[in-house]
């Protein structure tokens, strides 16, 4: 049965951020959202943090707002301008709202609909619905205004690694799981899930993200470090590149008219592919798993990565006229 936390309870920022930073997201105005977790004794603790100036992260004293969560945080997403959706180790999906000139985070709900860790979530374009996936093999579609699950699916036979809502399509999303399957969902259909098979799909997919300009195309990362570009209408034509040597932990497209694709991995590296699927950037600065990546909406050449090494690194692509040169940089700590 679903249970909620204390509604409307304001919480002040904690004194210290956990060591392992697990997710990063930009708001449209450039504000940066971080999620952090750490293991204390036998339990995971977590927190979320907002930095109006991203250059201040992860310095706690420079945050705009922050809050301790009841368990570790696996994923976060902005909901419009004031909401923050949280995926929790506890099995809960939580919604927080930032108030009081953005100095205070207030809990709006916490719903324990998953029977295990919530690993991933994604918010649809209209900001009223979201999708989550968990270690309980389930995918759930949420009505955020009603604080309720609209639909729950069990099409995966193992834990769900990633979900991705389709930009501009409020009934379509992707999911991938440890069962090796990538599923295309359309919740309007009686049988909403369709399996997407392509030439490199004999490995376990770990991350998926939609191409921002093409609603029939998505990128996929897998456990071996491969990144693939897949057209839903012709999946056998997928392009695949061995970008990393270990598990892909995240993918993110830039805001360019011909968007770049950033990838991060457990091999502790960061890479960027251009529209021709050629590598134009690589960074080796992280000293542990890289776990989050997001592009700045204000400076399209800038993107940010975070990792279990507690680093928040801001990277800059070379000018578009020089992207044919492979760049290997060491970002500032």
UniProtKB/Swiss-Prot annotation:
Show me the WD repeat boundaries.
Answer: 16-59, 68-106, 113-152, 155-195, 199-240, 243-283, 285-328
Q: Name one GO cellular component term.
A: methylosome
State where it is primarily located.
cytoplasm
- Compartment(s): Cytoplasm; Nucleus
Tissues of expression: Detected in egg (at protein level).
**Position of the signal peptide:** none
Q: What keywords are assigned to this protein? A: Cytoplasm, Nucleus, Repeat, WD repeat
One record GO biological process = oocyte axis specification
Q: Kindly indicate whether the keyword Repeat belongs to this entry.
A: yes
One of this protein's Pfam families, by short name?
A: WD40
Question: What's this chain's function?
Answer: Non-catalytic component of the 20S prmt5-containing methyltransferase complex, which modifies specific arginines to dimethylarginines in several spliceosomal Sm proteins and histones. Required for normal prmt5 methyltransferase activity.
Record text on subunit structure and interactions: Heterotetramer; dimer of heterodimer with prmt5. Interacts with histone h2a and h4 and with nucleoplasmin.
Which protein, by its recorded name, is this?
A: Methylosome protein WDR77
| Lineage, opening ranks | Eukaryota, Metazoa, Chordata, Craniata, Vertebrata
What would be the name of the gene that encodes this protein?
Answer: wdr77
């Amino acid at each position: 049965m679903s249970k909620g936390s204390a509604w409307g309870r304001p919480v002040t920022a904690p004194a210290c951020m956990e060591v392992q930073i697990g997710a990063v997201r930009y708001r449209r105005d450039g504000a940066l959202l971080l999620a952090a977790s750490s293991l204390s004794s036998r339990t995971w603790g977590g927190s979320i943090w907002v930095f109006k100036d991203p250059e201040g992260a992860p310095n706690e004293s420079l945050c705009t707002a922050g809050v301790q969560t009841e368990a570790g945080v696996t994923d976060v997403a902005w909901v419009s301008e004031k909401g923050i959706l949280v995926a929790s180790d506890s099995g809960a999906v939580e919604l927080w709202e930032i108030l009081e000139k953005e100095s205070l985070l207030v809990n709006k709900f916490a719903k324990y609909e998953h029977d295990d860790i919530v690993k991933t979530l994604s918010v649809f374009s209209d900001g009223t619905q979201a999708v989550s996936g968990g270690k309980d093999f389930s995918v759930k579609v949420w009505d955020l205004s009603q604080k309720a699950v609209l639909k729950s699916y069990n099409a995966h036979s193992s834990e769900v690694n990633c979900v991705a809502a389709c930009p501009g399509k409020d009934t379509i999303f992707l999911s991938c799981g440890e069962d090796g399957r990538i599923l295309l969902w359309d919740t309007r259909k009686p049988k909403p899930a369709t399996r997407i098979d392509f030439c490199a799909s004999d490995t376990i997919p770990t991350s998926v993200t939609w191409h921002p300009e093409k609603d029939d195309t998505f990128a996929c990362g897998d456990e071996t470090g491969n990144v693939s570009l897949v057209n839903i209408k012709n999946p056998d034509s997928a392009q695949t590149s061995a970008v990393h040597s270990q598990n892909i932990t995240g993918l993110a497209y830039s805001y360019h008219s011909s968007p770049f694709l950033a990838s991060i991995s457990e091999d502790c590296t960061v890479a960027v592919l251009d529209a021709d699927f050629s590598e134009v950037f690589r960074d080796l600065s992280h000293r542990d798993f890289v776990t989050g990546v997001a592009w700045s909406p204000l400076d399209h050449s800038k993107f940010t990565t975070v990792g279990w090494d507690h680093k928040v690194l801001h990277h800059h692509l070379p000018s578009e006229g020089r992207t044919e040169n492979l760049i290997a940089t060491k970002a500032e700590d």
